[in-house]
Regions:
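Bacterial N-terminal signal peptides
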Residues: 33-45
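Outer-membrane beta-barrel "beta-signal"
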Residues: 450, 475-488
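N-terminal periplasmic/intermembrane-space "pro-region" immediately following the signal or transit peptide
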Residues: 51-154
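Sequence/structural signature of outer-membrane beta-barrel proteins
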Residues: 148, 190, 206-212, 242-248, ...
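Outer membrane beta-barrel
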Residues: 112, 123-302, 321-326, 330-334, ...
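Detector for outer-membrane/organellar transmembrane beta-barrel domains
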Residues: 327, 332, 338-438
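N-terminal secretory signal peptides that target proteins for export/translocation
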Residues: 1-31
């Protein structure tokens, strides 16, 4: 189909789709070419989804073809009617007609290449859903080759340093994985009055590995994002799984896509089902306030099973029988029109209830976040304090009280090369009232990201982690990661 289309498209104005030919002048030739291009577009759009759908598509094309043939007949009749007086006027009139035809010839020559280009572009990017809504497929193939000097809890994306193994087992690790690769779809939905609707879905392969001899190379798909969104000029409503409202900042990294850098070292993070409302309020030409509020699924409790299960268990969050609530107020300022230089400061909070076996308890947190850019320099970070926020990576993933945060610096050295570095810490407090196996976690990272082409990027990242247990020696790990990412 595509090769045929390319051959037909390169034939220029002599294209023929079985429509009666005539030599009545450039207007008719342009009409035939427009009809040919339209027929090609119709053929291209006829993507079958089944036998019945194919028959419907063919039937619709035949009806459309008959309609277009009737229009061509009408054009031919109109052309004959207009040229009849000119033919009886003599040679002088014939000369003016030739001039008119010469003037119309460039117009037809301009229309056809444009139509061919549009149809060719349509063939390259056209993806269609069952409901005929515009659909875009995207993805990133990510390769991570890594090395650890110590005992990392997650080899490819470490965030806690585990105790050293008993002798004679050596410390450290080396391997490579593709399980941070991801793909998804974006759907442009129908307009609802003045509102635009859209949908977003993304998955990766970080959902675990099967209990098999070579399970390391069999990453299980994991749902990342899945939400529907309706938005207007200043207001948006979203329902589905997205990053939580609390503490939305994350460090910049190509090697840590499944879980962000500094997770459990001052960076709170969770993707969770939710329903949220966003409101933007202008405060001058360059300033605006952003208000966000919503309710979230009550995610809490440690899933202790060592194997995959078919249904979610009824843990401390679900047993609370009520959603969690989060909100954020942010002020954003652009330094000038058309510039990416900006400053944004936000304050956010979380409140929820949990009901473990020992009785009900509260979960709360407050956070301040910052993001700024000036020229090639950028800075970002957040600070938080909270209780029972283990589901967000707070308190080192433990049921306790803690405070922490992170700070990141960014430098766009060139249009293709960027340098990033940051430091984070998570420290428990009220340790006597809320004891836990781990007391503190610190992390430092630095990376370079080089954009080889718009689709291909490479990154080298170094991470240093130090975990302090309640008893015993501090544990350290050096992590090196070479990441390659191809986006489509």
């Amino acid at each position: 189909m595509n090769s045929w289309f390319r051959r037909a498209a390169t034939q220029g104005r002599s294209c023929n789709l079985g429509i009666p030919q005539a030599s009545d002048g450039p207007i008719l030739r342009a009409s035939r070419c427009v009809l040919a291009g339209t027929f090609l577009v119709l053929c291209l759009n006829a993507v079958p989804v089944g036998a019945q759908s194919l028959e419907e598509e063919v039937r619709a094309m035949r009806i459309e073809l008959r309609r277009l043939q009737q229009e061509v007949g009408t054009l031919k009749e109109e052309l004959r009617r207009r040229t009849a007086p000119a033919e009886s006027a003599g040679s002088g009139s014939q000369g003016s007609q030739e001039k008119s035809a010469a003037a119309q010839e460039p117009a037809a020559a301009e229309v056809l290449p444009l139509l061919q280009a549009q149809v060719a572009e349509h063939a390259q990017v056209k993806v269609e859903s069952n409901s005929r809504l515009p659909l875009k497929i995207f993805g990133t193939i990510v390769s991570n080759t890594f090395w650890n000097s110590g005992e990392a809890n997650w080899l490819d994306v470490p965030n806690i340093v585990a105790p050293s193994p008993d002798a004679p087992v050596p410390k450290g690790s080396f391997s490579s994985t593709m399980r941070q690769s991801r793909f998804g779809v974006i759907v442009d939905g129908p307009a609802i009055g003045s509102l635009k609707s859209s949908g977003f879905l993304a998955l990766d392969f970080f959902g675990g590995i099967p209990n098999f001899q070579t399970g390391q190379v069999m990453g299980i798909p994991r749902l990342l994002y899945a939400f529907a969104r309706v938005e207007g000029e200043h207001t948006a409503v979203e329902i589905g799984q997205d990053q939580m409202i609390l503490a939305p900042r994350n460090p910049t990294s190509l090697a840590a896509m499944a879980f962000p850098d500094l997770y459990r070292s001052g960076n709170l993070y969770l993707r969770v089902p939710q329903a949220r409302v966003e409101q933007r309020i202008a405060a001058g030409d360059l300033d605006e306030f952003q208000l966000t509020g919503g309710i979230l699924a009550p995610i809490a409790g440690d899933f202790a099973a060592n194997s995959l299960v078919f249904v979610p268990p009824n843990l401390a969050g679900e047993r609370s029988r009520r959603p969690a609530a989060q909100g954020r107020v942010a002020w954003r300022r652009r330094f000038s029109y058309g510039s990416e230089d900006r400053l944004e400061i936000g304050v956010s909070g979380h409140y929820g209830r949990e009901r473990p076996v020992m009785g009900p308890r509260r979960s709360w947190a407050g956070a301040v976040d910052l993001d700024a850019r000036a020229g090639r320099l950028g800075i970002g970070g957040e600070w938080f304090a909270g209780r029972n926020i283990d589901a967000f990576g707070g308190s080192l993933g433990q049921v306790a009280k803690s405070t922490g945060g992170f700070l990141e610096g960014r430098l766009a050295a060139t249009r293709r090369l960027e340098l990033n570095a940051g430091v984070g810490i998570d420290r428990l407090f009220d340790f006597d009232l809320f004891p836990a196996p781990l007391r503190q976690n610190r992390s430092v990272f630095a990376n370079t990201i080089f954009q080889i082409t718009p689709e291909l990027a490479a990154s080298f990242e170094y991470r240093w982690l130090m975990t302090t247990p309640a008893r015993g020696e501090m544990r350290r790990n050096n992590h090196l990661n070479l990441a390659l990412a191809f986006s489509f």
